[in-house]
Design a protein with these regions (language model features):
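Amphipathic repeat-derived elements
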Residues: 10-24, 92, 145-146
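N-terminal low-complexity or amphipathic/hydrophobic leaders
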Residues: 20-96
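A short linear-motif detector with a strong N-terminal bias
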Residues: 10-15, 37, 63-64, 88-91, ...
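N-terminal start-of-chain detector that recognizes signal peptides
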Residues: 3-9, 29, 81-85, 101-102, ...
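Long, contiguous binding/interaction regions
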Residues: 2-15, 123
């Protein structure tokens, strides 16, 4: 079932869809989302620039603006993601269907390129479809920026 990007966001926003979007909007750009307070945003931006293979930056929002103006101007990043993992001090502390109650006026959102974007091309080429997405932590160090550092994940 291939929905348009607007249809999948609407289904998520209205509670008709929760979870991963793999196989649902396969012909559209899909992105990972990182949201940080403005005080941490510059360091993360530099981290993404230094490590563009593992953090391919698609868009950065203005502080407090939950709308990705370039990629999806009809989207609301507080409500239009299938499931949000809330990470504090490096650990997942909660998973919620929307983050309106958590949103702060100093939040900056980073949209990062995702392998979900090309998963449909793999299916079209005859590769078996899967609901899981593999991520692998390598032994390659990322170039640090401020408080952001670690091994490359692909």
């Amino acid at each position: 079932m291939d929905l348009s990007s607007i249809e999948i966001r609407e289904a998520i926003r209205t509670g008709k869809w929760e979870g991963m979007t793999v196989g649902r909007a396969g012909r559209y750009v899909q992105a990972g989302l990182v949201i940080l307070p403005k005080i941490q945003a510059y360091d993360f931006l530099v981290f993404c620039q230094r490590n563009s293979k593992s953090c391919p930056l698609l868009e950065v929002t203005d502080p407090g603006d939950p709308v990705p103006q370039q990629l999806a101007p009809s989207a609301d990043l507080r409500t239009d993601i299938g499931l949000y993992s809330i990470i504090r001090d490096g650990s997942v502390v909660d998973e919620v269907p929307d983050i309106r109650s958590l949103w702060q006026e100093d939040f900056v959102a980073f949209l990062l390129g995702s392998s979900l974007t090309f998963s449909q091309a793999l299916v079209d080429a005859g590769c078996t479809s899967s609901v899981g997405i593999g991520m692998y932590k390598t032994n390659i160090d990322c170039l640090p920026a401020g408080r952001f550092a670690g091994k490359m994940v692909v």
